[in-house]
């Protein structure tokens, strides 16, 4: 009995009972093929040492690195001079976009893997992601029906020619794998969770191909009954979730719409080009959403595809006043970022400054699809680099793909196995927090919704050091710096342009990410 009480107390303190003076539980390190992971089970999981009170003249530093540091906390006192060659100047008079927040997707695969673990571990994982003591995620992406990260293709109405959607119903996947965990996340976030929905395909009977999987577009005329039914399908979805006690903040009309023309595409998709999406929004989807009290305030994000589509996609849609009245943002994915530079995001913002930019999907191990690499630092660095590039070019928030997968990187009906921030080993009843998880923490813990990105100037910098700076609503400033060099450390001096003699001196180690919070 004493042992059981001790274990329960440990779990409670680890995930629910932090005070500002609490210490963290360190990473339970396990060396895997590609590096170090943090092992968690029903009785133990590492936690993040709280920031505490940040006072003038003191900085708090968190470090995550290839060599095993995982959100290690330290403190610095300011100096009045520095010999560091790399100077970082923060300029709070130069302001950019507000921060929207960070998040992940509630896929079938994630829910299936959660169900492989006991209730205590399920609750741990939700707390690790969505509570203030964890990553503090505020976004949840919810697929409408099946994706490749499902075990089979299904829609909410697979009855042919049911144009009135009389047979529309949520499925067992929603009721078992999505809704329970969404509700837990809503609670863990303290009501701050913002959900947005995205379809991968219409029911197969609505498509030219006759199947959800593979290329195809909606049948018939763009104002015809198939398109009309598809618009009403969205309303039905949101009303069904509303009946379950879940309301949404936003939606996108289609996940990666340009893939729907690829004859070799192996999972669910539906083709739209920019003009088709414009017409669908302005003539059918926008009016349909506006007609229901449940959906009338939903924010539509366009594109939800690679940034290679920019600025063409918003040029087509947002220059049409009727379509534009329904649109609030532009969604981007990261999979072809190597083709177009991040500056295309700034170009898009400058053309359409009234519309936010949100990164809505990313995962490592996708090209080729080779599943998880346990302990991989290079994948963690991929995330950090993309976060810096995106947010440095007007992207307001960043949403990861599956929040948990198995050791294979699934389940996935197309064998499109990829990586995730958390990987579950159901046989051992444990899970592994990848370095990616802690990289996300370096941003999401200290760059809160409502913060403003501010100016940063790195002088005499190495090409391997890059970063961002933010002004938080509580008056603290956050600087995130990434060192991509595998060998060299860099001495860095951080100061405000407005207070050049208040300097924080530190060394950023090879292959490391640091976050500095000061006032």
UniProtKB/Swiss-Prot annotation:
Signal peptide start-end: 1-24
Key words, A-Z: Hydrolase, Lipid metabolism, Signal, Sphingolipid metabolism
Reaction catalysed by this enzyme: a beta-D-glucosylceramide + H2O = an N-acyl-sphingoid base + D-glucose; a beta-D-glucosyl-(1<->1')-N-acylsphing-4-enine + H2O = an N-acylsphing-4-enine + D-glucose; an N-acyl-1-beta-D-glucosyl-15-methylhexadecasphing-4-enine + H2O = an N-acyl-15-methylhexadecasphing-4-enine + D-glucose
Pathway: Lipid metabolism; sphingolipid metabolism
Disulfide bonds: none
GO molecular function: glucosylceramidase activity
Superkingdom of this protein's organism: Eukaryota
One cellular component (GO) term of this entry: membrane
Catalytic center residues: 256, 361
Pfam families xref list: Glyco_hydro_30, Glyco_hydro_30C
Underlying gene: gba-4
Identification of the protein by name: Putative glucosylceramidase 4
């Amino acid at each position: 009995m004493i042992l059981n009480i001790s274990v329960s107390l440990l779990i409670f303190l680890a995930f629910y009972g932090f005070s500002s003076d609490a210490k963290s539980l360190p990473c339970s390190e396990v060396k895997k093929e590609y590096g170090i992971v943090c092992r968690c089970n029903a009785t133990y999981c590492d936690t993040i040492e709280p920031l505490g009170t940040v006072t003038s003249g003191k900085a708090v530093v968190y470090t995550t690195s290839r060599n095993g540091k995982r959100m290690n906390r330290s403190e610095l006192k300011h100096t009045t001079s520095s010999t560091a060659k790399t100077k970082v100047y923060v300029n709070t008079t130069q302001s950019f976009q507000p921060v929207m927040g960070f998040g992940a997707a509630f896929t079938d695969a994630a829910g299936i893997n959660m169900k492989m673990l006991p209730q205590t571990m399920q609750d741990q994982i939700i707390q690790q992601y969505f509570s203030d003591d964890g990553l503090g995620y505020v976004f949840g992406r919810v697929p409408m029906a099946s994706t490749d990260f499902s075990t089979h293709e299904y829609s909410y109405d697979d009855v042919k020619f049911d144009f009135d959607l009389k047979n529309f119903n949520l499925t067992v996947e929603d009721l078992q794998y999505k809704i329970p965990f969404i509700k837990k996340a809503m609670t863990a976030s303290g009501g701050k969770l913002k959900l947005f929905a995205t379809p991968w395909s219409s029911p197969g009977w609505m498509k030219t191909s006759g199947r959800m999987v593979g290329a195809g577009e909606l049948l018939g005329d763009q104002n015809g009954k198939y398109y009309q039914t598809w618009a009403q399908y969205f309303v039905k979805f949101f009303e069904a979730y509303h009946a379950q006690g879940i309301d949404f903040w936003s939606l996108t009309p289609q996940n990666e719409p340009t893939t729907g023309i690829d004859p070799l595409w192996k999972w669910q998709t539906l083709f739209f080009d920019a003009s088709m999406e414009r017409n669908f929004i302005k003539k059918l989807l926008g009016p349909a959403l506006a007609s229901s009290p449940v959906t009338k305030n939903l924010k539509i994000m366009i594109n939800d595809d690679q940034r290679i589509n920019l600025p063409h996609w918003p040029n087509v849609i947002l220059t049409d006043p009727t379509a534009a009245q329904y649109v609030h943002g532009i969604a981007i994915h990261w999979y072809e970022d190597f083709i177009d530079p991040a500056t295309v995001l700034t170009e898009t913002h400058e053309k359409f400054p009234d519309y936010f930019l949100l990164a809505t999907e990313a995962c490592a191990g996708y090209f080729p699809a080779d599943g998880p690499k346990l302990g991989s630092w290079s994948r963690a660095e991929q995330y950090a680099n993309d976060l810096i590039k995106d947010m440095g070019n007007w992207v307001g928030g960043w949403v990861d793909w599956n929040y948990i997968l198995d050791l294979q990187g699934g389940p996935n009906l197309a064998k499109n196995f990829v990586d995730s921030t958390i990987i579950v080993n159901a046989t051992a009843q444990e899970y592994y927090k990848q370095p990616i998880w802690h990289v996300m923490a370096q941003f999401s813990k200290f760059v809160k919704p409502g913060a403003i990105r501010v100016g940063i100037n790195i002088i005499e910098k190495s090409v391997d050091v890059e970063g961002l700076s933010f002004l938080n609503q509580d008056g603290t400033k956050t600087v995130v710096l990434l060192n991509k060099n595998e060998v060299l450390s860099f001495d860095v001096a951080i100061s405000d342009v407005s207070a050049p003699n208040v300097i924080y001196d530190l060394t950023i180690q090879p292959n490391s990410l640091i976050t500095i919070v000061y006032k």
